[in-house]
Swiss-Prot record:
Belongs to the UPF0619 family. Glycans are attached at N207, N227. This is UPF0619 GPI-anchored membrane protein C1322.10. It is found in: Golgi apparatus membrane; Cell membrane. Residues 243-262 form a propeptide. Keywords: Cell membrane, Glycoprotein, Golgi apparatus, GPI-anchor, Lipoprotein, Membrane, Signal. Its main location: Golgi. One of its GO terms (cellular component) is fungal-type cell wall. It is a lipid-anchor; GPI-anchor. A lipid is attached at N242 (GPI-like-anchor amidated asparagine). Residues 1-20 form the signal peptide. It holds the Pfam family Kre9_KNH. Residues 136-165, 175-194 are annotated as: Disordered.
Length: 262
């Protein structure tokens, strides 16, 4: 007994789920123009079959007419048709049927209200139509999105800027600083003078006397260009003069001693 109740509820649930899809257009007040673009719209839920067969049906007149327009995704939400009907077919009492597309569910899922056709195509064979579904657009596909190439994304995400002083500039700056320091140091420690701002030449001289015996004179000059010159000379005139004077004094003292002895 419980098994039968469970089975009945199962099929009832499937039946209710199958009929969740609902046709919203065409309606009773709709008139399709034969041979022109006409639109079918519907709403669906996640429990509806993924695919549905679209049928154009007329059960209001005998013989009944059933035309298979094609299969669409139930999630599409709309489709366009370009159907023309032959001149012998009725212009009223038409409906759109949504049927199951699988062998497990081939029954009708939903039907539209009856609508009319206006016009016909006299070149068509009796009880025939031409055209059918020529486009089916999902409602969700109307939204658009743009994507950043990996390569651009990579370039954008990895792009950074850094500033560093070139090695040549650093070396030049260091050399200039050293040269400036050398010039300043030389000018501060010597009695020389900078003769030209452009040439940056430093000259210096010094004199020294050692014990009164010799005198040495040294002069030097240097430039920022890297050239330097120096000269030195030593004079012994002081030593010779002192020696002669001492000999003279000794001679005088010797003569005086001889005179006293005599």
């Amino acid at each position: 007994m419980l098994a039968r109740v469970g089975t009945t509820l199962f099929f009832l649930a499937n039946a209710l789920a199958a009929y969740a899809v609902s046709v919203t257009s065409p309606t009773r007040d709709t008139t399709w123009q034969s041979g022109q673009v006409n639109t079918v719209t519907w709403s669906s839920v996640s429990t509806d079959p993924e695919e549905m067969v679209i049928m154009l049906v007329n059960n209001a007149h005998y013989p009944n007419q059933n035309f298979n327009l094609g299969t669409v995704q139930s999630s599409a939400g709309s489709l366009d048709t370009d159907i023309s009907i032959s001149s012998d077919l009725p212009t009223d009492g038409w409906q759109i049927y949504f049927n199951g597309a699988t062998s497990q569910n081939q029954g009708s899922l939903a039907q539209s209200e009856q609508f009319d056709f206006e016009g016909s195509d006299s070149t068509l064979a009796a009880s025939t139509i031409s055209g059918g579904i020529y486009s089916s657009t999902s409602a969700s596909s109307t939204s658009s999105s743009t994507a950043t190439p990996s390569s651009s994304s990579t370039t954008s995400s990895s792009s950074s800027s850094s500033s560093s002083t070139p090695i040549s500039s650093s070396i030049t700056s260091s050399i200039s600083s050293s040269a400036s320091s050398s010039v300043s140091s030389s000018s501060a420690s010597s009695s020389g003078s900078i003769s030209s701002a452009d040439a940056k030449t430093v000259s210096a001289s010094s004199n020294s006397t050692i014990s009164g015996f010799s005198t040495s004179t040294t002069s030097a000059s240097s430039s920022a260009a890297g050239n330097s010159s120096s000269s030195s000379y030593t004079s012994y005139s002081g030593a010779v003069s002192n020696g002669v004077a001492q000999l003279s004094v000794a001679a005088c003292m010797g003569i005086a001693a001889l005179m006293l002895i005599a």
